[in-house]
Every structure is written in structure tokens, then in C-alpha cells.
A protein has these predicted regions:
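C-terminal regulatory/interaction module of P-loop NTP-utilizing enzymes
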Residues: 1-189
């Protein structure tokens, strides 16, 4: 048989590894997909032998490329279903409805105290990814100011994504202070 002529290796999919890879600028995965995978980790890989399409890190990255071009909202389901399967498409397009109701990111970056902090975990995952994507040297103090109002889990998520995306931002004084605070809490907890 043909399969005896090939090497077979089973790989395990890890959400943290995927997200660390996805936030890097050179991989350019859209924040909506990163947030979604964090919120629904079971959707990163869901192989069903009978399915034509199913989610994997590769198909999710391919979907990101398609969506990055800007597609009409009524086409998102069809693209997601064709690339990652029906179940993924249902969950993802539902998530997008939440994502699109996020607080105004530009307002957070300029006046973080004027924006209410959401309480829904789905929204917080989406918000952390969106903020990390927009963080730069000019707005980092405001990003951290807003981050301090988030729960610890989302503070850590935000700092991790920022530092993976741009290590230089990890040298910001506000970033360092919050990071030290989180490390102190973790070591005492």
C-alpha cells in the first residue's frame, strides 16, 4: 500500500502557539480570527473525516487572507463555510456580530477613561486582540491605562499579544509596570 511509503506524524494543535504565531506582523492574521480562536479554542482544529472543509490553523490562515481583502458581510458565511466548514462558519459569523459592537478603538487610544469596559468575555477577547493590533509607541500609555481596567486574564492576553507583535513596545514604562504587577500577583497567588 502507498501509505507504507510515507512517514506519518501526528501533530497536536495548540491555541497559544497558534495565537503567538498569528499576531506577528509577518503572518498578518486578522484580529477577528485570532480573537475568535481564543474564545472558541475547539474551533482551531475540528477534523471530521466526512466533512469537505474543516478548521485547521492552515485553513484559518487562508480564510484570513480572503477576508483581509474586504468582503461584503453577506459573503462572510459562505467564505468561512467553504474554507473551514459549516460549524465554524456559524460560530464565527455569530462572533463577528459581537466583534462589530466593540467600543471605539480610536477613542480608547486617545481617551481611555471615556470608554466603558465591556463585561462579556467574548467581547473582551475581541477587544484585547483589536487593541494589541493597534498599539504603537505613540499610544501605548493609553492602551495600558485602559488595560488596567480589564480583568487580569485580559491584561495578560493584551500584553502578550503586544510583546509578540512588537518587542520594542515591551520597553514602554507603562507596559513594564503593568507586566511587573501581573508577575507579582502570579508569584504570590
Amino acid at each position: 500500500p502507498l501509505r507504507s511509503r510515507m512517514w506519518h506524524c501526528e501533530l497536536k494543535v495548540d491555541v497559544d502557539d497558534f495565537c503567538a504565531w498569528a499576531v506577528k506582523p509577518e503572518n498578518d492574521i486578522i484580529p477577528e480570527l485570532i480573537s475568535f480562536v481564543r474564545w472558541k479554542p475547539d474551533q482551531l482544529h475540528d477534523f471530521e473525516p466526512d466533512m469537505t472543509a474543516y478548521p485547521t490553523p492552515r485553513t484559518i490562515a487562508m480564510l484570513s487572507k480572503l477576508l483581509k481583502g474586504g468582503v461584503p458581510a453577506d459573503m462572510e458565511f459562505a467564505l468561512a463555510e467553504g474554507m473551514c466548514g459549516r460549524g465554524f462558519a456559524i460560530e464565527y459569523t455569530g462572533f463577528l456580530k459581537v466583534y462589530r459592537t466593540l467600543p471605539n478603538i480610536k477613542k480608547i487610544l486617545t481617551d481611555p477613561d471615556s470608554v466603558d469596559v465591556p463585561t462579556d468575555p467574548c467581547t473582551l477577547y475581541a477587544l484585547a486582540s483589536a487593541l494589541a493590533r493597534q498599539a504603537d509607541a505613540g499610544n501605548m500609555d493609553n492602551v495600558i491605562k485602559f488595560a488596567k481596567r480589564l480583568g487580569r486574564e485580559f491584561q495578560l492576553l493584551l500584553l502578550t499579544d503586544i510583546s509578540v507583535r512588537d518587542k520594542k513596545l515591551g520597553q514602554n514604562k507603562s507596559f513594564i509596570a503593568l507586566n511587573c504587577e501581573l508577575q507579582t500577583i502570579a508569584s504570590n497567588g
